[in-house]
Amino acid sequence: MSDLENLLNTGLMSNENGISPETRDLLIDSNFSQVVNYQEDTFIVTQGSEPDALYFTLSGVFHAISHANAQAPQRLLGRIEAGQFVGDITLFDPESTASASVKAMKNASTLKITPDSFKAFCETHPAQALELVSALARGLAARLRAANEKVL
């Protein structure tokens, strides 16, 4: 099974937990996204930089890491595995900077959606865009609940 086929059955891309097959197929269309492969130890997002895309993990594992300053040790915030996403904030707040770095822990691949592609998707497929945004919001809410549990 290919990385893309794996993604179709996991996380936000699965019909059970996220978006419909119709929306998924429209999103995967090459006009709206691209598959990008990464070598181990490659950063796809760097803390403090302007994020450039939403990334759905197809294969491999990424770590979200942060540090308070250049001298502080890195702190592991979480693992991002197949079916999970990062970079979502850039779609909703394009002026933001990345609050953490995201690093491939082994060879990995993602489905990358740029803000311009996301905007085009929203303009040409508004009903499916609403479905995608709702699924992203559920994913963000789940992250927030998990973060609250760690703090409390």
Protein language model features and the residues they cover:
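Cytosolic regulatory regions built on CNB/CRP/Popeye-like sensor folds
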Residues: M1-L152
